[in-house]
Amino acid sequence: MYQSLMTVRETQIAIKEVKTFFEDQLAKRLELFRVSAPLFVTKRSGLNDHLNGVERPIEFDMLHSGEELEIVHSLAKWKRFALHEYGYEAGEGLYTNMNAIRRDEELDATHSIYVDQWDWEKIVQKEWRTVDYLQKTVLTIYGIFKDLEDHLFEKYPFLGKYLPEEIVFVTSQELEDKYPELTPKDREHAIAKEHGAVFIIGIGDALRSGEKHDGRAADYDDWKLNGDILFWHPVLQSSFELSSMGIRVDSKSLDEQLTKTGEDFKREYDFHKGILEDVLPLTIGGGIGQSRMCMYFLRKAHIGEVQSSVWPDDLREACKKENIHLF
């Protein structure tokens, strides 16, 4: 039966250790400045992240003006707008401590309706919009993960060390070709188990089979220049997503992707106009799950062991039977 390696109190202390180390190194190595972030945005701005395009945001109106507002799902689009508003230049970027509510999240060991992540975004030049630049950025972030594991091992040697020296890059099409009989999720399990750490490139568009590896909203990532960082989780014995990131859409890729998804109505939103008219800067960015990170590096079996959220009674009871104690 599962046994946590730390008490609840020890876990809370270690969570701070994880977050403080990672935040400091992320800012230094990607040359990012911390900024304040909104909990909600106006509906008409189009700044909310609609994730896979089907999740419902929490909506409410403001008494003063009647303006319709939405609790953010993530800050994928807001960050790009902020870089423009704050006058950042190529090579400069920002990050923020993002908190969100995703009401339609399917709850399980790795998913909660409460989301906390480091959301970051950086301005790039046109010639940087390449797979090589994407991979270079992934390697920088992976280096932070490696150093974090080493740092924690010095303080908590019982946590062990599991990350391989190198992260492997593979495209979603190569995965389909390698494992044609498996579902996309099972392909992720297979490749993560084989290598320990992988970055899957190209998520959102249809593969040669006609199926997508996974859904992505049409209006933030360029589907050819994005991907997910996955580790093999030693406790769960499954693939484990730490980050979704990518080079963002330019006017050409946004035009193509909105057409593919049948979302031409979004062309009238301020944010989308800013991209289509080449007003907003070209960027790369992503989200790095804070609770996910703590769950992996502290060897936890459930995300509820590293964050406070709301869980159905039957799920809490099931966890108790497995010796999993949720916050």
Swiss-Prot record:
It is found in: Cytoplasm. PROSITE patterns: AA_TRNA_LIGASE_II. It catalyses: L-aspartate + NH4(+) + ATP = L-asparagine + AMP + diphosphate + H(+). One of its GO terms (molecular function) is aspartate-ammonia ligase activity. It is an enzyme of class 6 (ligase). It holds the Pfam family AsnA. Disulfide bonds: none annotated. Its EC number is 6.3.1.1. SUPFAM superfamilies: Class II aaRS and biotin synthetases. One of its GO terms (biological process) is L-asparagine biosynthetic process. Keywords: Amino-acid biosynthesis, Asparagine biosynthesis, ATP-binding, Cytoplasm, Ligase, Nucleotide-binding. The keyword Ligase applies. InterPro entries: aa-tRNA-synth_II, aa-tRNA-synth_II/BPL/LPL, AsnA. Its main location: cytoplasm. Pathway: Amino-acid biosynthesis; L-asparagine biosynthesis; L-asparagine from L-aspartate (ammonia route): step 1/1. One of its GO terms (cellular component) is cytosol. Belongs to the class-II aminoacyl-tRNA synthetase family. AsnA subfamily. PANTHER family: ASPARTATE--AMMONIA LIGASE (PTHR30073:SF5). This is Aspartate--ammonia ligase. It comes from Bacillus cereus (strain ATCC 10987 / NRS 248). The gene is asnA.
